Design a protein with these regions (language model features):
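A short coil-to-beta-strand element that immediately follows conserved catalytic motifs
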Residues: 66-78
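Catalytic core of Fe(II)/2-oxoglutarate
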Residues: 133-180
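A generic structural micro-feature
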Residues: 70-72, 93-97, 166-170
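Non-heme Fe(II)/2-oxoglutarate
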Residues: 1-67, 88
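Hydrophobic residues positioned within well-ordered beta-strands of beta-sheet architectures
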Residues: 76-78, 99-101, 172-176
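A short local structural element in Rossmann-fold oxidoreductases
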Residues: 5, 115, 163
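Catalytic core of non-heme Fe(II) oxygenases with the double-stranded beta-helix
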Residues: 80-153
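Short N-terminal helix-initiation segments at or just after the protein's N-terminus
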Residues: 20-26, 38-50, 95-96, 115-125, ...
C-alpha cells in the first residue's frame, strides 16, 4: 500500500489542474476526478491495480447474474481522492456506469465510513421506521468502515456518500467506474 500511497501523493503534487479544480470548488484535499483521465498509463502501479480490479469486477458481475451478452465490462474512469480533515463527499451515484467501487489506501482512525442509502428511501414510501437492532440489510443506511487495501464494489445506481472526515489525517482512496 505504501507504494500506491506515494504514487497518489506524487500525482496530486504534479496535477495543477486538479489542484485548481479543488480550490475553485472548495474541495478540502485533492481529487483527480475532474483533471486526469490517464492514471492507468501514468504510473505502473495503476496498471497493476487495473488487473486486480478487472478480476474483482468480473467476479462481482458474475455474482450479480448480469447478462453481458458475451461482452466484458471495461474500466471507464479511475481517480484519486485525498480527503482532508473536515472534507466530505456528498451523496451521489455514478450515472452511465454499471459497477463502481473504491480501493482504500489510507484510513486513519476517526476517519469517516462510507455510507450507502437504501434505494427505496427517496421514493417517499409510507413505511414504518426500522427497529434499532434491525438486520443491517434492512436499515435505510449502511455504514462500512473499510480497511486499508480493501476494495468495495457496488452497482453504480446505489446512492452513497462519505460523511465529514473527523480525522486530522487524510483519508486516501482510489475510486473507479466500469461500463460497457
Amino acid at each position: 500500500m505504501l507504494e500506491i500511497e506515494k504514487s497518489c501523493w506524487s500525482i496530486a503534487q504534479d496535477d495543477e489542474a486538479g489542484q485548481k479544480w479543488c480550490e475553485e470548488n472548495n474541495y478540502p484535499g485533492y481529487t483527480s476526478y475532474a483533471s486526469l483521465s490517464d492514471l492507468i498509463w501514468r504510473s505502473p502501479i495503476f496498471k497493476d491495480l487495473k488487473k486486480i480490479l478487472d478480476l474483482h469486477v468480473d467476479q462481482f458481475s458474475s455474482e450479480l447474474d448480469f447478462d453481458l451478452e458475451g461482452r466484458d465490462l471495461k474500466l471507464e474512469d479511475v481517480w484519486i481522492n485525498i480527503l482532508a480533515e473536515g472534507g466530505n463527499h456528498s451523496a451521489h451515484l455514478h450515472p452511465n456506469s454499471i459497477i463502481s467501487g473504491t480501493m482504500y489506501i489510507s484510513m486513519p482512525s476517526e476517519t469517516s465510513a462510507i455510507k450507502f442509502e437504501d434505494p427505496r428511501h427517496p421514493m417517499m414510501m409510507a413505511a414504518p421506521s426500522r427497529l434499532v437492532d434491525a438486520k443491517e440489510y434492512l436499515k435505510p443506511f449502511i455504514y462500512i468502515n473499510p480497511l486499508v487495501g480493501e476494495i468495495l464494489l457496488w452497482e453504480s445506481w446505489l446512492r452513497h456518500e462519505v460523511p465529514t472526515n473527523m480525522s486530522s489525517e487524510e483519508r486516501i482512496s482510489i475510486s473507479f467506474n466500469y461500463s460497457w
